[in-house]
Amino acid sequence: DVPVFAGCDRPMGRALVTAEHVHGETGLNGPDLPDPSMPLQDRHGVDYIIDTLRREPAGTITLCPLGPLTNIATAFEKAPDIIPRVQEIILMGGAYFAVGNITPAAEFNIYVDPQAADIVFKSGVPITVMPLDVTHQALVTRARNDAFRALGTPVGTAVAQMTDFFERFDKAKYGSEGAPLHDPCVTAYLIRPDLFSGRHINVEVETGSELTLGMTVADWWGVTDRPTNALFIGHVDADGFFDLLTDRLARL
């Protein structure tokens, strides 16, 4: 069993923004999931991050945030000694060519806590970014969703029901062939980085403008002399990604 720790319940410097209209009240609407059988751990999630990075050998821990970067930024602010101990951060967030999905300029995860994202991107830790540019290439089409359901397992059925729920919103909003699978791109990159390609560029987060708050300003073309601080992924082999995902779901 994997222990679960509750982290921060609000952004570092602004009111919380949520997205029930996309993923439902639970964030996982669609399947009829059982209630969790394992309670939350007593320790705060930020303290768990700090303690783990201090306990394990430096350069052996990769952080994989799939939401706002509040917990990591808070840990970095509380215990700056852990920053050089992080091997890498692989995150789902941001956008460049795909522009925003919560505002015209900003992707949701970064927009929720732009102050935290700014801290993380300026930390000096090696960062790999899975932006909307690449997650919108990983579309759950009807055929791909049928492949999940055809596994004939509780996991395959639950995933198919979940992506069915997302698909209705995403197809209506974007006019695409299916729903983008955002978060699994991070895990897929850990297993098969060869499925992805991108550029080492400078990425900074807008924190001062009301109009473009939370925008990931990505110097894709290298038009500034700002130092590179992130591998910004721009392409995924979508067929290879879904083959990998279906194979791994079949093992559960």
What annotation goes with each model-predicted range?
Residues 111-115, 130-252:
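Conformational coupling and interaction surfaces
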Residues 6, 66, 92-93, 207, ...:
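Short glycine-rich loop/turn motifs that provide flexible caps or phosphate-binding loops at active sites
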Residues 1-56, 228-229, 233-236, 246-250:
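Metal-dependent C-N hydrolase catalytic cores
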Residues 4, 120, 187:
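A residue-level signal for conserved active-site and pocket-lining positions in enzyme catalytic cores
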Residues 8, 18, 24-27, 36, ...:
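Glycine-rich, flexible loop/turn motifs
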Residues 15, 26, 31-137, 142:
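Active-site histidine-anchored catalytic micro-motif
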Residues 18-23, 88-90, 156-160:
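Short hydrophobic/aromatic-rich motifs at helix boundaries and adjacent loops
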Residues 1, 9, 54-58, 77-81, ...:
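Generic secondary-structure signature for well-ordered alpha-helical cores
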